[in-house]
Regions:
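A positional "C-terminalness" feature that preferentially activates on distal terminal regions of long
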Residues: 501, 506, 510-512, 520, ...
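Second RecA-like catalytic domain
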Residues: 36, 241, 246, 258, ...
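Residues in well-ordered beta-strands of folded domains
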Residues: 82-86, 100, 184-186, 248, ...
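Short, solvent-exposed cationic patches
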Residues: 324, 552-572, 744-766
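Short acidic-hydrophobic surface loop/beta-edge motif
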Residues: 173-176, 527-532, 720-725
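P-loop NTPase motor module signature
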Residues: 1-426, 494-498, 538, 555-557, ...
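Charge-dense polyanion-binding interfaces
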Residues: 122-123, 243, 252, 256, ...
């Protein structure tokens, strides 16, 4: 075995620790041999018993590591060491070490939580924190806690916060020294623009190619950037001994193996890779790394229930991983296409995917595992309640779980298929063999990058027709991967290949079964649609799909206020399940209750008919709700009502001990359903229009909410009017914002009034707003006696000048008060 690898130095410690502890955390830098050497040394320590499962985040790494381990013991992959990835496996009855992708372990646990025959599970490259690894670890820990206390769990990584994981798993830590050669880091003067990444990377590759020896590994965010960069480099390097190879997940296994194989004699290699090449993979001869500083991250939009890829800055731990690729075989160089200053702004660690991903597959797997509450699992990072709620909502609509979160029979079948629950529902919803074959073709097209993405049409049927045409002519080209996936699904569903033409509406019906909230109805302008989940979307006006009345949407971009449709098919309204609802609502424009019987698909109304015998209680609830929303203006909220509210509020301020009822507008709106229903129905008839509701005497209704004994107190403490010497009864204004109630009265009506009137049993003086004959304020006072003795004479001069025909006596206290004009 490779005893020269650094990981060999900790092999004995690992075996000793596993005899004493159930869990273990191992850290070792890139190139230490942890992924290839340690599983073999652990197997030796097991004395020929049991099996080891090792999880890798990527298929390519799983294959290469298994093949490398097998070669170390002089065997082909599939004997002692094998691998199992999606749609491919090399294992046998002799296999003792299985290298798996993370989703495979989840399905194994769902099928058999005891994992009979398995002694050790290794989570390799755990720092990547994919949702699959977090779920697999949570399920494994749950199995260990409940039924497999003898199961050993090992977490392995090069860069990770070991303290948090050791604490969560109650696990010791074993650290391995590395064998890294020095790597010189060269920073860019300015940051790379994510929209021109491929150009910047191509320029950096050419610079490194001129100035240094060795193969080059360049990291770009995604497949599209790689393809653009590849075109530039191939054109520039034509006629040289340098070969350019792409490396990303959608490449065939054969092309991936060719990319990571050693260079031919006299040849230089440039590998353009996604983050697939950050860890585990060994690419022989690499001495130069070009790091764009970006990656593609799947972001789940809670508002729309959709996920979309975003190009984002990498974290520091990712940058360290990438840099390490340059120092595995010799001294190396790493070009970082960002400034040293901006590096301080980068996150230390990448976010766990579980914080932002679509949790629907995860929640279904948990239900199939036997846990109805995902939060009951021992998570390293707990998923958000809102994302779990959305996932459960979708699974309910797909009939995969029950209301209590337990898995249905259909849901268990869905969980057994290696695909998203939507895709599984579509395939399992198919009845005939022809439908199943069609669903398999559609599933393959939906899972892979659209080969016709540059085509302006969103027609899904067109893609199926093209796939079947190419397959029949045995000229698959870029459809090869899709054809392979479709074949694997047909094998699982036990149906034969079918290349016959398909009915577009049948395609639409299958899409609708997978995406029930994405059934779309045409609205307004050509190309504008609204989905049954409520979101507005659009299709290019030149797309023939834009002319249909109803569509089922398979793919769209959720960015912005309107989603753009990429894949769709027409659907017949007769093929879609509808629900009938009695819709009672308040029509603000008409000012009336609207009662309709509606046939709906989700939030879309297919048909609406008026009804006249709706439930009275429901109608009353709708009116009360409308009042809460639109305000008391729906009723006759007049000055009389406002004055009553103000009187009661003043008494509450003066006497909090009296427990006066709350007649504030805010409280009345909040409690409308408590006081209003009795008055909506009178003598068996409901008031259902604004006109009828405004006939209600709101002041009388509110006064009735006040107990009789308190009514008497209010009338006594805060009377509505007060008599003045002229004989007039003047209304008292209890307006808010003033300490004292206001009495607005013409000055002439107060001749002979010696003292300021009081309310509240003489505790509150009124604020006298004395008015001119033209009802204009001339004086404010709470001390009427002082006014007569002083200020009155100044006011009298001005009033005599402005109102010479009126009587302005020199001795107002002995003069007769008048209402109108008293001639001199």
């Amino acid at each position: 075995m490779a005893s020269n690898l650094p990981a060999f130095s900790i092999a004995d410690s690992i075996n000793q620790t596993l005899r004493e502890s159930a869990n273990l955390v191992v850290t070792a830098p890139p190139g230490a041999g942890k992924s290839t050497l340690l599983p073999l040394t652990i197997l030796e320590g097991m004395n020929g018993k049991g099996k080891i499962l090792m999880l890798e985040p990527r298929r390519l790494a799983a294959r290469q590591i298994a093949e490398r381990m097998a070669s170390l013991i002089g065997e082909p992959a599939g004997k002692t060491v094998g691998y199992r990835v999606r749609f491919e496996n090399k294992v046998s009855a002799e296999t003792r070490i299985e290298v798996l992708t993370e989703g495979i372990l989840t399905r194994m646990l769902v099928h058999d939580a005891t994992l009979e025959g398995v002694d050790v599970i290794i989570f390799d490259e755990f720092h990547e924190r994919s949702i699959h690894s977090d779920l697999a670890l949570a399920l494994t820990l749950q199995a260990q806690n409940i039924i497999r206390p003898d199961l050993k769990i090992i977490i392995m990584s090069a860069t990770i916060d070991t303290s948090a994981i050791c604490q969560a798993l109650h696990a010791p830590l074993i650290e391995c020294a590395g064998r890294m050669f020095p790597v010189k880091t060269i920073y860019a003067e300015t940051d790379t623009d994510k929209y021109t990444i491929y150009k910047e990377v191509a320029a950096a590759v050419m610079r490194a190619h001129r100035e240094h020896e060795g193969d080059i590994l360049a990291f770009l965010p995604g497949q599209a950037d790689i393809q653009r960069c590849e075109e530039l480099l191939i054109a520039t390097l034509a006629g040289t001994q340098t070969q350019v190879y792409p490396l990303y997940g959608n490449l065939s296994p054969e092309r991936q193996r060719k990319t990571i194989a050693p260079s031919l004699q006299g040849e230089r290699k440039i590998v353009l890779a996604t983050p697939i090449a950050e860890t585990s993979l060994t690419i022989e001869g690499v001495r130069i790394v070009i790091d764009s500083g970006f990656c593609r991250q799947l972001v789940y939009d809670v508002r729309t229930g959709l996920s979309h890829l975003e190009t984002v800055r990498i974290s520091k731990d990712m940058a360290i991983q990438r840099r390490g690729r340059a120092g595995r075989v010799a001294e190396g160089i790493c070009y970082r296409l960002w400034s040293k200053t901006s590096e301080h702004l980068m996150q230390e660690q990448r976010k766990p995917e579980i914080e932002e991903a679509d949790l629907t597959p995860m929640v279904l797997d948990i239900a199939a595992f036997g846990e109805s509450d995902p939060m009951s699992l021992p998570w390293l990072t707990s998923p958000s309640n809102s994302n779990i709620f959305n996932a459960k909502h979708l699974l309910l609509s797909l009939q995969a779980i029950n209301e209590d979160g337990s898995v249905t029979l259909l849901g268990r079948k869905m969980a057994s298929l290696p695909c998203h629950p939507r895709i599984a529902k579509m395939m399992l919803n198919s009845k005939t063999d022809a439908q199943k074959a069609l669903a398999c073709d559609m599933a393959a097209v939906l899972e892979e990058k659209d080969p016709m993405s540059e085509h302006e049409d969103s027609d899904m049927t067109l893609r199926i027709a093209m796939l079947r045409s190419q397959r029949e002519r045995k000229n698959l080209g870029k459809w090869a991967r899709i054809a392979q996936i479709a074949q694997e699904y047909r094998r699982m569903l036990k149906v034969k290949e079918d290349n016959h033409p398909v009915d577009p509406e049948e395609v639409g019906s299958l899409i609708a079964s997978a995406y029930p909230e994405r059934i779309a109805m045409a609205v307004d302008n050509i190309g504008d649609f609204r989905m049954s989940g409520g979101q507005n979307i659009f299709i290019d006006r030149n797309d023939p799909m834009s002319l249909h009345s109803w569509l089922a949407i398979a793919s769209l971009n959720s960015a912005g206020s309107k989603g753009k449709v990429f894949l769709s098919a027409p659907v017949s309204i007769n093929d879609l399940p509808t629900s009938t609802f009695t819709n009672i609502s308040w029509d603000s424009k008409a000012g009336a209750v609207r009662m309709q019987s509606e046939r709906r698909i989700g939030l879309l109304v297919v048909e609406s008919k008026p009804i006249h015998n709706a439930d009275k209680g429901q109608i009353i609830d709708i009116i009360c709700s409308a009042v809460r929303k639109e305000g008391l203006s729906m009723l006759d909220w007049n000055e009389k009502v406002k004055r009553l509210q103000q009187r009661v509020e003043k008494v509450k301020q003066w006497h909090p001990e009296m427990n006066m009822p709350d007649l504030s507008t805010e409280h009345l709106l909040t409690t409308a359903s408590a006081w209003l229903p009795f008055y909506i129905e009178q003598e068996g008839k409901l008031r259902t229009t604004s006109a009828e509701l405004r006939k209600l005497d709101l002041a009388e209704i509110l006064w009735a909410q006040v107990p009789y004994e308190l009514q008497e107190e209010i009338d006594h403490l805060a009377p509505t009017h007060i008599a003045v010497p002229s004989g007039s009864r003047i209304r008292i204004d209890y307006r808010p914002g003033t300490e004292a109630p206001v009495l607005s009265v013409r000055l002439q009506e107060c001749f002979g009034m010696t003292q300021t009137p009081k309310v509240d049993n003489g505790r509150q003086r009124l604020l006298m707003e004395l008015l001119s004959p033209g009802f204009k304020p001339v004086q404010l006072t709470q001390d009427l006696a002082s006014f007569w003795q002083g200020t009155y004479f100044e006011v009298r001069k001005e009033l005599k000048r402005r109102y010479p025909k009126h009587y302005w006596p020199e001795n107002p206290l002995e003069s007769e008060a008048v209402r109108g004009v008293k001639r001199k």
